[in-house]
Amino acid sequence: MNREPDSTVEQQHGSGHLENDAERDTLDFSRQIKTEDFSEALQTGIPHRPCHLSQASMMGGGQMTGEMTSLHPLQQLVLVPSHLQSASQYLLSQSQSGQQGLYQPNHLSLPQQQGGILQPQTGLGLASQAVGRPGLPGSSLESHLEMGHLHAPKHLSVVSDEPSDLEELEKFAKTFKQRRIKLGFTQGDVGLAMGKLYGNDFSQTTISRFEALNLSFKNMCKLKPLLEKWLNDAESAPSDTALTPSANYAQLSEMFGRKRKKRTSIETNIRLTLEKRFQDNPKPSSEEISMIAEQLVMEKEVVRVWFCNRRQKEKRINCPMNLPLKSPVYNSRMVPTSGSLGSMSMTVTSSCSPGNSSRPSSPTCGLQPCSPGSSLISSKPTVNTSGYSNSSSWYRWNHSQYFH
């Protein structure tokens, strides 16, 4: 009784083996067709990058197991058009999982290859190892990465050098300004001189911005050697031509532009002495100016200019206080001035009563009757017009004939 079930089990097991062998044959046949399609697609789509996984997948059918189906989505994924890098990375991840399941029970030498593939690398190093170029010693990606590693320390060194360059530029700008003022040149003179010497015209604004560190770092680095060269030439030129200054004065003026006269600085005690002298005599004569210059050990021209400037300053200080108030302007026909009234004597005889009593009165009383019953006795008032001409407008206006 026990043998019959065993025989049936063996028959079922044998039939199962036959079915498995048939399925393996069909799988091997379909796999070979698909791998051929896969290799053709890779050769047409990616001619310069043949994949090594197609060769690894063409192993004998006896070594394959039922897990071969994991490669179907892999081959379908490769046939879909997409970006090369993303497809190759996904292809590698799928192939690694399939190979781990396929070759672990057979103990082949493929895990060593997998270990080489699974080494951690930065960036795209994984794709560069799995996909190689035949006939080339190394891929361009590896060389690109190597060049990137080479360029990195140079960039860091440039960044670290910038603060020192900025400090040097600041120091040079300060020293340049001090030496330029000491030589007596303006910023405009420096720009003109550099244009004549080196062919690059610079405006006064450019030199001013350089001294104030308002230019860009690149422009300041370009301008620094030119300014340094000009400064050295300007300082060395007077010492070389000290023996013949008159012959080379025109040449120096053309080379270095207009040379500004140095500003005269007067000490505090000398200024106080000059102030005292100005309070005593704001406008000294030429002899007095010479005496003051000798006493203070100064040039006569400097003392004279100081007194001129001091007088102008005094005028600016006192001018608003001493301005006279302007008298109102009136027409000469309307109201006479006070001076004309003082110099004029007027005698008017009029009759303001029936008794014909005469009395001096104001001009208005003589020109018109003071009461309704009064009569005008003298039609022409006696007026002393000394200092006035007969044709003056005031006289004609006040004349009695204008009222008739």
From Swiss-Prot:
Transmembrane segments: none annotated. InterPro entries: HD, Homeobox_CS, Homeodomain-like_sf, Lambda_DNA-bd_dom_sf, POU, POU_dom, POU_domain_TF, TF_octamer. Gene3D superfamilies: Homeodomain-like, lambda repressor-like DNA-binding domains. Its main location: nucleus. Residues 187-235 form the POU-specific domain. Residues 350-363 have a biased composition (Low complexity). Pfam families: Homeodomain, Pou. One of its GO terms (cellular component) is nucleus. Residues 1-29, 44-67, 346-367 are annotated as: Disordered. Residues 259-297 bind DNA. GO terms for biological process: regulation of transcription by RNA polymerase II. It is found in: Nucleus. Transcription factor that binds to the octamer motif (5'-ATTTGCAT-3') and regulates cell type-specific differentiation pathways. Belongs to the POU transcription factor family. Class-2 subfamily. This is POU domain, class 2, transcription factor 3L. It comes from Xenopus laevis (African clawed frog).
